[in-house]
C-alpha cells in the first residue's frame, strides 16, 4: 500500500536575506541532566521535547505576525527517523525517513503540554514499520514509472530538485534533526572538546536545526539565511520558561 504525499503547506517565516549567502549560526547549549529531567516530567523523549519547544516558538511568532487566527497556517516540524531500527540494513548510506509533527493554530491556543502530547503520539504513529513501508512503497512506485525510467539522468536531477523544493520542504516550517549521543572510541575522547551538528537552511524556508549531545551538554545548532534572529529568540524563551539553563553563542558579524 502506498502512502499519500498530500499535506497542508506549513507557515514559513520570512525576513531580510543575507546579501552574500552568509549563514547565521546560533548554538544553544543545555545541560543533559536538566533536559532529561524536563523530558521525563512531560512524558516525552529529548527529541520530542525540543521539537515541542520549537513548535511553540514558531506558534508564538506566527501569532505575532498574523493576528487573525483564521489566516494562520499549520506549524509543522520535520523530524528525521533512522530506519535501521525498523528494517535490517547494513548500508553505509543515509537510510532515513521522516515524520512531520503538526499543530493547527486555527483550532485554538496550545499549551506546551498539549504540544508535547501531540508530538509524542505523532512520532509514535509515524515511526512505525508499516507506516514507513507505505512511504517507501510510494517512492519505489515513482522509480518504476516507464516515463522516468527512460528519462535522461540530468533531466531527472533537475525535475527532482524542483519538485522537492516545491512540494517537499514547503510542507514543514523547518527540520529538527537529533544526532543523539555521539559515541567515539575511548582513545579519542581526550582530544575532543565538543561536537556540533549543523545542517544548512532549506531552499524555501530560512531556518533549520541540528542537535547533538557530547558529554554533559546538548548542543542545539540553529541556522538561518536571513538577518532577523526572531525564531531563535523565541525558542530561547521557551527553553528558559521550562527551567532550563541555556548558554548561547553565535557567529553574528
PLM region descriptions:
Residues 1-44:
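Flexible, P/S/T/G-rich "lid" or insertion loops adjacent to the active sites of thioester-utilizing
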Residues 25-30, 36, 60-253:
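Acyl-thioester-dependent acyl-group transfer interface
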Residues 46-55:
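Short amphipathic alpha-helical segments
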